[in-house]
């Protein structure tokens, strides 16, 4: 008898093998669909006439929808790698995906009653992530998991507050909780960038991986997240606009300091380093402009926050998609052209969204934000087109998301 060759695994088996394979495409699809729906199909409104303004539904869906799926994929992939413990697979990942998907149903139409189900679903996956990281930290206390656990816990609390405000119909509380959730996500971004940037930069500087020439100053690792935490605490206690404005500027400057760390010689022009530093640049610029707005600058805070949350978080998420999508599918750097093109499209979309309101660019003809939303959607779809063959193919030994 001849030995039967191994059967090709099903698509579900491949996607369920690792968190990023399932959740990065989900995040990309949601990130492409939702802003396009809201700006062009819904015309900045919502199908249902609920208690919450459409803009709050929009912000909630971006933070806990697009970025939330990216977060689930990253945490369920990176934490096992950092702790050298088995990663969640199969049913666990699909259960998280189901919880995340249910949470998105209410956001598609802005219905208050469906919001109850969405609240339960979002709280479920948020708390599950916190419990998962805590369990791994207990099992491997020597691994540096306090910072991710701290910021994840803060995001879970902010998410519960957002959903609670939606259920109560409290617009002011919802607005405040969404802002805090976005800031907490920026703090988490600072932690992730610190973990990801070092191995990526060292791989670029020494592809043989025999040395580690890039060693950022230890004191700078938590500077940006620490100052973002100060902003969050100030927002919670309700300090004056002037005080919170100066704190925002300080946090933005700390992200700018990350950009300075990216100057590692001629390799600083590599797309991978430019992408990661651009995330810090947009985060920093947005926070600084938000702070100056609170100090009386002649523009609103909203476009500045879009630079930080749409730009800093968006480019950071897409950078991780592009880099980890190679490392965890048996490939390596440099980034393929489609990934570079997707990143360029995303930065363009962010600038088209924010700069007209800041008075830097003239308003373009057509529906407000339509072009920015279209280019934003194209960025995610271009990345997905390039990486879907990698993510949907059987697993190969790859690199990683950090040390």
Describe each model-derived feature in a short phrase.
Residues 1-403:
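Hydrophobic alpha-helical transmembrane segments of multi-pass integral membrane proteins
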């Amino acid at each position: 008898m001849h030995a039967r060759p191994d059967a090709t695994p099903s698509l579900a088996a491949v996607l369920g093998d690792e968190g990023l394979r399932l959740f990065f495409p989900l995040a990309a699809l949601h990130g492409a669909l939702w802003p396009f729906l809201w700006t062009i199909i819904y015309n900045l409104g919502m199908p249902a006439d609920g208690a919450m303004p459409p803009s709050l539904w929009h912000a909630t869906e971006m933070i806990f929808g697009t970025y939330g799926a990216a977060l689930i994929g990253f945490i369920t992939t990176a934490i096992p790698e950092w702790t050298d413990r088995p990663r969640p697979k199969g049913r666990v990942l699909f259960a998280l995906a189901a919880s995340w998907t249910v949470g998105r149903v209410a956001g598609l139409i802005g219905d208050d009653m469906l919001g109850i189900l969405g609240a339960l679903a979002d709280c479920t996956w948020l708390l599950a992530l916190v419990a998962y990281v805590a369990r791994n930290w207990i099992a491997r206390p020597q691994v540096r998991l306090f910072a991710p656990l701290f910021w994840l816990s803060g995001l879970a609390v902010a998410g519960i507050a957002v959903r609670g405000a939606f259920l109560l119909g409290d617009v002011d509380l919802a607005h405040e909780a969404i802002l805090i959730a976005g800031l907490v996500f920026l703090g988490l971004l600072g932690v992730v960038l610190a973990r990801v940037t070092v191995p990526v930069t060292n791989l670029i500087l020494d592809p043989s991986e025999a040395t580690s020439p890039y060693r950022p100053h230890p004191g700078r690792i938590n500077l940006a997240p620490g100052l973002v935490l100060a902003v969050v605490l100030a927002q919670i206690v309700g300090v004056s606009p002037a005080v919170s404005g100066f704190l925002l500027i300080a946090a933005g400057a700390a992200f700018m300091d990350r950009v300075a760390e990216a100057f590692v010689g001629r390799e600083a022009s590599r797309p991978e380093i430019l992408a990661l530093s651009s995330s810090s640049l947009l985060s920093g610029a947005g926070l600084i402009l938000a702070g100056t707005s609170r100090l009386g600058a002649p523009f609103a805070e909203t476009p500045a926050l879009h630079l930080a949350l749409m730009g800093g978080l968006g480019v950071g998420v897409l950078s991780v998609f592009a880099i980890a999508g190679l490392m965890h599918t048996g490939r390596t750097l440099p980034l393929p052209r489609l990934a570079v093109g997707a990143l360029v499209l995303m930065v363009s979309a962010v600038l088209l969204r924010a700069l007209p309101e800041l008075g830097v660019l003239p308003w373009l003809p057509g529906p407000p934000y339509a072009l920015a939303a279209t280019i934003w959607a194209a960025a995610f779809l271009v990345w997905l087109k390039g990486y879907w063959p990698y993510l949907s193919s059987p697993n190969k030994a790859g690199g990683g998301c950090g040390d």
